[in-house]
Amino acid sequence: MTVELSDEEMLRYNRQIVLRGFDFDGQERLKAARVLVVGLGGLGCAAAQYLAAAGVGQLALLDFDTVSLSNLQRQTLHSDATLGQPKVDSAREALARINPHVRLVPLNALLDETALAAQIADHDLVLDCTDNVAIRNQLNVGCFQHKTPLVSGAAIRMEGQISVFTYQDGEPCYRCLSRLFGENALTCVEAGVMAPLVGTIGSLQAMEAIKLLSGYGTPASGKIVIYDAMTCQFREMRLMRHPQCEVCGSH
């Protein structure tokens, strides 16, 4: 279902609307979309601000953490003024300034599997911007069950990666990826991360989400795209569905 754009919105989003093949239809699809952003750290801040600026109709912001001083190096929606606040409230304030037309739904909670699945079912797309292996796996299971597209990003040290899962027949899921590469529980706290790297990966997540929601372009589904910031090189690998995968396999 699409919704009509106001005159103000048509002017605001003009640079997207004039893109050949995107047009008013693509922008109206964005306005009608509901996106769940899980994690309002470096990746989530970058992705959410571009989704808001681009005109996604509703952003649900899910995180249970509060803003700390060490976050401010890379989490661009937060500031000194919001130290100690829940990240979802800090992000909501910043996003409302970016685009007042977007409906923002803060979810300051650590949801159990049932509650998380209910949120997934209520949205058109999920952005995995967490650094928590257990939550990543829960998102994958819920998205697979409801066939909700999942855009997953990760960044550590000077390397980032992005994967898109649409759960079509024969396509892999996030668990297939983690079975192949292992589940690295190392976080930025131990290993560090360069600030612009998370912005790069988060922006790519927003771009893939926009493509999926609007039907514009070719999403990076069924593969992993890896960015090496030390050499400014991208490489990609095609992913195969693991036949013994606990989530999507035939097991």
Predicted regions and their residues:
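Adenine nucleotide-associated cytosolic modules
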Residues: 1-251
